[in-house]
């Protein structure tokens, strides 16, 4: 099932930059703004979310990207390869253990049709706590905090942006435009390998089940720039259904929303013809991000 699948394009690239930056191993004293790279524990009510802040070697203050992972039991170590993409561009990275995993407290639950309307907002509340924390960090620019939501994380990112005036923009990859119910239905249909992407997309009109979490309201309310990236050969998430929903909202609500389609890319961001990662994927994201950061 798509909801049990982890998608991390930074892992696909497979390049890990080893940092020599000084780590913040000692806890921050009370009432003192956090500073430096390293591990931080962030409170969200009774829950503690633990993550790592990676900083560039150039002088700050820095913009910072919060990586919101997809589904599955993913901890921050899976997102470490993002360092090699962001840090050379002067962009800091915050990666974290999901609630109930790694060093984060609470109970971990897989998202499904029945619990998604509760768990997606719950995960957004954890990210919102991270945003609020990073806005106080001495080495970061509080006006240049942005979110990367991949797969399931693409449902989370708009919710966070709508609840904070600290989020500058969001980037979403292979997800976030359709309801949980539609995505699960599509994923199940796609088990039939004889059906084409266009046939699978057309069959979504037959879905009459429960929606589960539906992102429509969050997308309509979104008021920050957003970049969506999709693979045209994705058999886990309904790319063309998603794009149709996003285009409709863009036109009706006059949103600053950019959609990039990589025609031969699958859910794992691999070109199905070449078996390789698209070399234009990250350069296009960096260029768009820098345009929003004014760099």
Predicted features, each with a name:
Residues 27-58:
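N-terminal cap/lid segment of alpha/beta-hydrolase-fold proteins
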Residues 86-107:
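Conserved alpha/beta-hydrolase
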Residues 115-138:
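Alpha/beta-hydrolase active-site loop
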Residues 133-187:
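Primarily recognizes the serine-hydrolase "nucleophile elbow" in alpha/beta-hydrolase
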Residues 222, 228-230:
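Short beta-strand/loop motif that positions the catalytic acidic residue
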Residues 235-242:
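Conserved alpha/beta-hydrolase "acid-adjacent" motif
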Residues 265-268, 273-295:
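Catalytic active-site module of serine/aspartate enzymes centered on a nucleophile-bearing elbow/loop
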């Amino acid at each position: 099932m798509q909801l049990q699948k982890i998608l991390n394009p930074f892992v696909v690239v497979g390049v890990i930059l080893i940092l020599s930056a000084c780590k913040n191993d000692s806890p921050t004293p009370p009432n003192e703004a956090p500073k430096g790279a390293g591990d931080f524990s962030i409170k969200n009510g009774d829950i503690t979310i633990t993550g790592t802040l990676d900083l560039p070697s150039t002088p700050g203050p820095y913009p910072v990207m919060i990586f919101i992972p997809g589904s599955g039991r993913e901890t921050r170590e899976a997102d470490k390869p993002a360092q090699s993409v962001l840090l050379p561009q002067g962009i800091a990275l915050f990666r974290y253990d999901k609630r109930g995993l790694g060093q984060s407290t609470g109970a971990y639950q897989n998202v499904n049709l029945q619990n998604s309307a509760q768990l997606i907002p719950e995960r957004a509340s954890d990210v919102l706590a991270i945003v609020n924390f990073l806005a106080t960090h001495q080495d970061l620019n509080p006006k240049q905090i942005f979110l990367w939501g991949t797969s399931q994380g693409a449902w989370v990112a708009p919710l966070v942006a709508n609840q904070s005036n600290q989020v500058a923009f969001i980037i979403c990859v292979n997800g976030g435009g359709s309801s949980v119910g539609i995505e699960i239905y599509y994923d199940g249909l796609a088990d039939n390998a004889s059906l084409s992407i266009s046939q699978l997309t057309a069959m979504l009109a037959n879905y009459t089940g429960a929606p589960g979490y539906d992102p429509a309201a969050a997308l309509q309310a979104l008021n920050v720039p957003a970049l969506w990236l999709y693979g045209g050969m994705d058999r886990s998430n309904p790319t063309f259904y998603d794009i149709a929903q996003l285009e409709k909202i863009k036109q009706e609500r006059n949103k600053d929303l950019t959609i990039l389609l990589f025609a031969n890319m699958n859910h794992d961001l691999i070109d199905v013809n070449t078996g390789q990662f698209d070399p234009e994927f990250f350069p296009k994201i960096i260029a768009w991000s820098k345009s929003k950061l004014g760099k």
